[in-house]
Amino acid sequence: NPVIDGSTVYAVGNNNILVAIDLRSGARIWEREIGSINQPWVAGKFMFVLSNNYDLFAIEKATGKIVWNTQIPLGKTKEDKVGVTASGPVLTSNRLLIATSNGYAFAVSPYTGKILGFITLSDGVGIPPVVVDNTALFATDDADLTAYK
């Protein structure tokens, strides 16, 4: 899903291309070799995108410069990570939230990329959390709805 912010369209695809395009002219402003099935999150001067390799990137919107990137830990061993997916990011209360299909939700600093903590959910999550009034709602695969402030 592309994101429109002002006169710029930000789009990312599974083909390892993240691109910023001028909405009026269609001219490419910048591109990076980052692929994702998740929608980028735009906030202020930055955008955040979770790559297909589960690296969370903070990128300057105007230039495409990568400010930081953090690997989201999907498991302790290679076998733990097989078939695991992640969704997000979603920004709320100065935290980027990432949910995983093996039942974890991570909070990451949007300023530094440091993982601030994680919680264990009752089951996996296949969709990004929804934020309502600074409360993050996680819908798990076993149909539990969990709210965190």
Regions found by a protein language model. Name each.
Residues 100, 108-149:
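Hydrophilic extracytoplasmic domains
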Residues 1-17:
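Solenoidal tandem-repeat scaffolds enriched in leucines and small polar residues
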Residues 19, 57, 106-107, 146:
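WD40 beta-propeller blade core
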Residues 22-25, 60-63, 109-113, 149:
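Short loop/turn segments that connect beta-strands within beta-propeller blades
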Residues 1-4, 27-44, 69-90, 118-133:
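Extracytoplasmic beta-rich repeat domains
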